[in-house]
Amino acid sequence: MPERTELSLKELYIGNAAVSRGLYEAGCSLISSYPGTPSTEITALETAFGASLAGVRSCCAMKHVGLNVAADPLFTLSYTGVNGGIVICVADDPGMHSSQNEQDSRHYAIAAKVPMLEPSDSAEAKAFAKAAFQLSEEYDTPVILRMCTRISHSQGIIELEDRV
């Protein structure tokens, strides 16, 4: 990696990339998602949970309808607790820009009794991804990071920091 200068400490990132940068800086060692059949979001969340039980910071990413599929392990995680922090990144789609419904994942956070963070721009997306691990480990619970279409695809300035 080239040496950073004062000018390169800030860069333009879309929201999704900012989350990725935040996960990296926070020391996330495993990211799982739903790559296609025959695996499912259930498998992805259970993989992240297994890593968490081993003390590894992990993340699972899915879109909002995938959270329906992963509801069983989500509710189990909420009462079994975690060892390494676990962040569940969920992409909601208000206005149905690229999905089949307008489901609101905030209802899952309430029902499962897990904290949810909802960034409003790229800088918050990065910061909240990092903060989610701290909350997860401090309170022994998974944390949902709710992204929506507009925040995921809009660009903003983020400050680059070193990995922990």
Region spans (language model):
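Thiamine diphosphate
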Residues: T40-Q103, H107-E137, C148
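Generic structural "secondary-structure junction" signal
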Residues: I14-G15, S33-G36, V69, E118, ...
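Conformationally flexible catalytic loops at phosphate/diphosphate-handling active centers
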Residues: E138-V164
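Active-site mouth loops of central-metabolism enzymes
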Residues: E3-Y13
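N-terminal glycine-rich anion-binding loops that anchor highly charged ligand groups
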Residues: E11-I42
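Iron-sulfur (Fe-S) cluster-binding modules
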Residues: M1-P2, D162
